[in-house]
Amino acid sequence: MDIYIDRLNERDAQALFAYECNNRRFFEQTVPGRGDDYYSFGTFGIRHKELLKEQEEAISSFYLIKDGSGIIVGRINLVDIDPVNGTAHVGYRIGEAFTQKGIANEALKLLVKLAPDLNVTQIQAKTTSDNIASQKVLVKNGFERISINEEISADSGQKLTFFHYSRNL
């Protein structure tokens, strides 16, 4: 499937909200949930504006992964951009109907190519120990696992094991 990454903007709010609602249960199988409030359009709209502000301030850079028709099939982001140290953290999620098509792999390749334009020279990532698909995407894109730790999820209170990865550009 041909995809491209498109920088998040105001006009994407409705389509992104629908994408998040449609994939909520699927996402919550492998990553901590975002809480019920996130799935109210009012709250979502506020959060969307906060993300755009972060992006304006160059703290983060958010992208929608779209297919050739412009349909949102996933998200990929660089957050906690540190221009002094050249570091950022990557996160991504692919909609349920679009998994196992190589989309996360291709989107991460595209993001890695544009990261130097944001003065990022090292990308860090973390994923839960049971998210094998994400681990494979990271390794396939040249990330190395650098540590493992356990954290308590703020939303669910459950103990999760995280694998931490890094890639120098």
Locations of regions flagged by a protein language model:
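Conserved acetyl-CoA-binding loop-helix of GNAT-fold acetyltransferases
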Residues: 94, 100-113, 136-140
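Conserved catalytic-core motifs of GNAT/GCN5-like acyltransferases
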Residues: 126, 144-161
